[in-house]
Amino acid sequence: MTAAENVCYTLINVPMDSEPPSEISLKNDLEKGDVKSKTEALKKVIIMILNGEKLPGLLMTIIRFVLPLQDHTIKKLLLVFWEIVPKTTPDGRLLHEMILVCDAYRKDLQHPNEFIRGSTLRFLCKLKEAELLEPLMPAIRACLEHRHSYVRRNAVLAIYTIYRNFEHLIPDAPELIHDFLVNEKDASCKRNAFMMLIHADQDRALDYLSTCIDQVQTFGDILQLVIVELIYKVCHANPSERARFIRCIYNLLQSSSPAVKYEAAGTLVTLSSAPTAIKAAAQCYIDLIIKESDNNVKLIVLDRLIELKEHPAHERVLQDLVMDILRVLSTPDLEVRKKTLQLALDLVSSRNVEELVIVLKKEVIKTNNVSEHEDTDKYRQLLVRTLHSCSVRFPDMAANVIPVLMEFLSDNNEAAAADVLEFVREAIQRFDNLRMLIVEKMLEVFHAIKSVKIYRGALWILGEYCSTKEDIQSVMTEIRRSLGEIPIVESEIKKEAGELKPEEEITVGPVQKLVTEMGTYATQSALSSSRPTKKEEDRPPLRGFLLDGDFFVAASLATTLTKIALRYVALVQEKKKQNSFVAEAMLLMATILHLGKSSLPKKPITDDDVDRISLCLKVLSECSPLMNDIFNKECRQSLSHMLSAKLEEEKLSQKKESEKRNVTVQPDDPISFMQLTAKNEMNCKEDQFQLSLLAAMGNTQRKEAADPLASKLNKVTQLTGFSDPVYAEAYVHVNQYDIVLDVLVVNQTSDTLQNCTLELATLGDLKLVEKPSPLTLAPHDFANIKANVKVASTENGIIFGNIVYDVSGAASDRNCVVLSDIHIDIMDYIQPATCTDAEFRQMWAEFEWENKVTVNTNMVDLNDYLQHILKSTNMKCLTPEKALSGYCGFMAANLYARSIFGEDALANVSIEKPIHQGPDAAVTGHIRIRAKSQGMALSLGDKINLSQKKTSI
């Protein structure tokens, strides 16, 4: 056992720089010194005994000269001294001197000072000698009637401990404490007494509870918590008692203490699965979330609500509470809001979706009135996505949502506007009846759009879905308005010339000489340098984008103009109008090409954009039926296929999720005939109090996989060889932020090994909590040594060290056995996670650490290799299965995972199979890993390389 596992009541720091005092000097100070000297001497004695010194000669001195003193500090120190001093002879008999000490205990138990009485009673809880306790029993009983509650509650604790360890000393303890409990008024005393009855005589505790079950609401919160625990344990052991106590739990839901309400709600859910019980518990959880200010508490209680939702029967009850759950959105914390919106979205039904949409619309409008903040922007995105999902699931709601969301297309926050655009694109494709409304609203906000990315998307939607002659003309009008005066080059040159004239007449301040790219001189005044800012602000949006050198939007505009021109030709029969419209579209494209070739834009037009615009010009000049089909039919079909694939993917993931949630009973499962209780009823559940205690102690028992190979033996690491004098192997147990090394050490020699010490050191973000204690191993004996290691981040860590020992009777130096390195597997800390494509791209751009891993494998199938990487790295593939299906010789996929420390890990797999090398050619390519920290990126890269080596063998 390690030092941390031994029972220890007192920890005292030992100064290493001072010399230990002699027994004679201590004896002199204890006999003849003043109170201060005796106090210091007593402290030194305590430290020496803790260090292993016996000091038997000082026991009588302390009894004679220190024990009679009434100083409170000395009395406190004496309690520590009597706790640690050896009280028995080597053969186990009580020392005669302890009779005198026992008399001192009795006097302290009758002391007029309540603190001395109470602290003495607490000290008696630690005594393990029945001979010392027996004479004190009358005094301990008398303390139950003391006027002060501090004495009474410690007397209850003392009686409970003595009854548990030495029942014969006080056989009537349960009856005594029951009588005490009936007449007691103090909350802490009642709590201690009731707790003792729960563990010592549960029937008496239940009898007492039955007599006062109607007054439970008036009890203090500490007693109420114990009552909840008792009811849970009783009903867990005996489900037939549920009807007897369920009303009490209902009453405790109205307690003034949040802790009691939380525990009562959790217990009620386990006691009953009736809709009224689930509704009451859920309502209690919601009230707690709203009223508690601590965000951690809110998140914990939200998790309990989410757990309730996982049960199919409970989910139907929670659906009626969606509007109550939405009250949690008043919390400013983003994580709480995110979980709340997801929960509401999972629970929403056709009955309450209208109310949900109304609340979300109000929340969206509220975000407009709040000063711009990063969390406000993110919250707006969450609201947009939630409304998007509602509209897809409930198409009738889309008409109410669209007008509110369309206003956000002109928002400064590009991410929120992009989410709105994605929603609008899906809505206009899915809902034919809303196309007119969407086009109308899009035209209203088109001129106010500030982001070029949103502008491109809006252009595409307008070009694809304006189907009437009036809409087409409106789109052309908006484009002309957004482009400004044409031809652009001539109008810009005229504007420059027009603006320079008045400036020439004004005498301006200092004129600065500048050298142009051509090597000539140019002048620039303070006035002329400040003018462009105002001029740029006055530019129409599309013109501004083009002059800034963003010609990608011009390529998108050319496609839009081509689509609407071809559609206009099909709708209007008059040749003159057809030619006029097509000519106008071609003029706009030509003027943009001219601008791109000129020196006016900040960046010249790219060859790709020139090719695209030229192609559109050619299509309009020829107007062939084939091109008409490609532009007006094939594009829309591509979007339809993409949305169908996305919807199918979502349905598939939901189906998998529901299959996980559904608890199926196998045909060969044993049947519980008693009341034909279902498998998920309480008598088959684990004790929640016991589970939480185990979790707090780090002893959480994880469920092993069905595969027999996935046992603890898989994690045993051999540290030394079988031929070494000391054989060692370790089991690495990972428990969230801790690693426990359980090391088996075997003495393989015929000698006794003394001071056998396991010396460990760490590499990486690991920290050894304590140094394992040395031990002695008999010939061919073995022992287990435990060592705790703290983990701070997801990074490959290495634990290394050696075992040193002395051979009994040998005069040689210490012997040393070097241990093999223990590599900590980061897969224990990485969990698959999901994020949107936009979030993935944003993180990809932000993360500064990249690790590029070259593919080196014998595998010949692209999909098999991807599955191998997913299994090796514990990451989730974000790329839809449909996009990965089929065979084309290459594959690209995005992977994502998150560590338990909140670190994100991204990976992009880009692999191909060289076709010219035949069907047996190995997969080639590379994997790029990005993370915020260097350790995460390197660790994942190492993991992939290691997995590749295994496949290459």
From Swiss-Prot:
Its main location: cytoplasm. Keywords: Acetylation, Cataract, Cell membrane, Cytoplasm, Cytoplasmic vesicle, Disease variant, ER-Golgi transport, Golgi apparatus, Host-virus interaction, Intellectual disability, Membrane, Protein transport, Repeat, Transport. The keyword Lipid biosynthesis does not apply. HEAT repeats lie at residues 96-131, 132-168, 240-276, 277-314, 316-353, 396-433. InterPro entries: ARM-like, ARM-type_fold, Clathrin/coatomer_adapt-like_N, Coatomer_bsu_C, COPB1, COPB1_appendage_platform_dom. Transmembrane segments: none annotated. The modification N-acetylthreonine is found at residue 2. One of its GO terms (cellular component) is COPI vesicle coat. It is found in: Cytoplasm; Golgi apparatus membrane; Cytoplasmic vesicle, COPI-coated vesicle membrane; Cell membrane. It is linked to Baralle-Macken syndrome: An autosomal recessive disorder characterized by global developmental delay, impaired intellectual development, poor or absent speech, and difficulty walking or inability to walk. Affected individuals have early-onset cataracts. Additional variable features are microcephaly, facial dysmorphism, metabolic abnormalities, spasticity, and lymphopenia. This is Coatomer subunit beta. It comes from Homo sapiens. The lineage of its organism: Eukaryota, Metazoa, Chordata, Craniata, Vertebrata. The gene is COPB1.
